């Protein structure tokens, strides 16, 4: 099945710039409606597939429509200024909760029905959400927030934007590498290093899921902080914590490993709202969807490379220590990028 899912992943990233272009020349609310209904219809069609090839086409269409959210949805979240950090943190938290809930919902459907309904039921829900959002838009409820005075005056790239985007690119690349590898490595690390707690893969898997769920709330804390303080010192703090705790993870077992892993993932998750807030400081609204689409594409490509790197190192017998050292080194680039970021007060 994996080869039939690859085109979906490729299109998920490759179509993001196209989605941004269409949103800029049409309408962000309209594109988000297309996102919900398009994913829903594609998922339902996949559920009615009669061959692996048809499943591959269905998954590919899901990837195309799924590519809309990050460049268009995030641009909507940061539109208008105000408490951007809190909104980004809340958006990221809901996204991570959705990722955590997906395998649980799929498992429940498969336990009581079959694989077809695992596509048809979520697809139907997505269409209903899309229709609800469309009605919300038509009623006038989805108007963008009233822009702050600073946001209204922010029509050109801010001074220092070139240096800021270089910093943002480095943070995105190195952060995507760390995040992509950590989502793969933690369940496997717990399975091997938590023998003193349990040898049941269901228990260690649940502990890994708990790490992701709890650490996701760090986005709210960081989001609130960057609404009140200058971004650069917050990014430096979040960046420095990553190589520190990633290095410590290589040497821990059982309960200590759980605590250190939780702290490491809090710093990893905490970085997510910061990068989009940096973008909001330096990039005017009319360019944000385009820059977000490129940022998302870089993140997806590097994350995939991180996954392959982790698998390769483990297959060669290098062990988890080697993987965690590589991740700690990658995280050091985030620290360097944080110091490279210009110091600038909020523009929202």
Locate the predicted segments by residue.
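Conserved MFS/SLC helix-loop-helix module at the cytosolic interface between two early adjacent transmembrane helices
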Residues: 13-50, 226-229
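Cytoplasmic helix-loop-helix junction between adjacent transmembrane helices
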Residues: 58-95
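Extracytoplasmic gate region of multi-pass secondary transporters
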Residues: 163-216
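C-terminal transmembrane helical hairpin of 12-TM major facilitator-type secondary transporters
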Residues: 229-275
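Interfacial helix-cap and linker-helix signal at transmembrane-aqueous boundaries
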Residues: 22-23, 108-113, 190-191, 225-226, ...
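Central cavity-lining transmembrane alpha-helices of secondary-active solute carriers
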Residues: 6-20, 209-221
């Amino acid at each position: 099945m994996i080869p039939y899912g690859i085109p979906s992943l490729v299109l998920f990233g490759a179509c993001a710039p196209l989605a941004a272009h269409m949103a800029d020349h049409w309408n962000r609310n309209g594109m988000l409606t297309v996102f919900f209904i398009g994913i829903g219809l594609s998922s339902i069609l996949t559920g009615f597939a009669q061959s692996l090839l048809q499943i591959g086409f269905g998954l590919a269409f899901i990837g195309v429509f799924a590519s809309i959210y990050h460049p268009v949805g995030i641009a909507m979240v940061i539109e208008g200024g105000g408490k951007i950090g809190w909104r980004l943190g809340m958006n990221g938290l809901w996204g991570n909760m959705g990722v955590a809930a997906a395998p649980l919902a799929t498992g429940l459907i498969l336990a009581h029905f079959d694989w077809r309904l695992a596509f048809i039921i979520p697809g139907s829900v997505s269409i209903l959400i899309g229709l609800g959002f469309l009605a919300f838009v038509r009623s006038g409820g989805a108007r963008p927030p009233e822009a702050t005075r600073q946001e209204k005056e922010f029509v050109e790239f801010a001074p220092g934007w070139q240096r800021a985007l270089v910093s943002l690119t480095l943070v995105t690349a190195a952060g995507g590498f760390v995040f992509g590898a950590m989502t793969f490595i933690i369940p496997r690390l717990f399975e091997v290093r938590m023998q003193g707690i349990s040898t049941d893969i269901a228990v260690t898997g649940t502990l890994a899921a708990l790490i992701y769920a709890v650490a996701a709330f760090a986005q709210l804390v960081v989001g609130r902080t960057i609404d009140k303080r200058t971004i650069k010192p917050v990014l430096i703090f979040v960046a420095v914590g990553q190589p520190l705790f990633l290095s410590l993870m290589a040497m821990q077992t059982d309960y200590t490993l759980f605590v250190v892993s939780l702290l490491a993932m809090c710093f990893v998750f905490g970085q997510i709202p910061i990068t989009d807030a940096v973008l909001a400081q330096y990039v005017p609204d009319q360019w944000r969807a385009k820059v977000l689409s490129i940022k998302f594409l870089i993140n997806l490509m590097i994350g995939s490379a991180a996954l392959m790197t982790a698998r390769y190192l483990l297959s060669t017998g290098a062990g988890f220590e080697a993987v965690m050292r590589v991740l700690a080194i990658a995280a050091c680039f985030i620290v360097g990028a944080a110091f490279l970021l210009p110091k600038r007060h909020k523009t929202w």
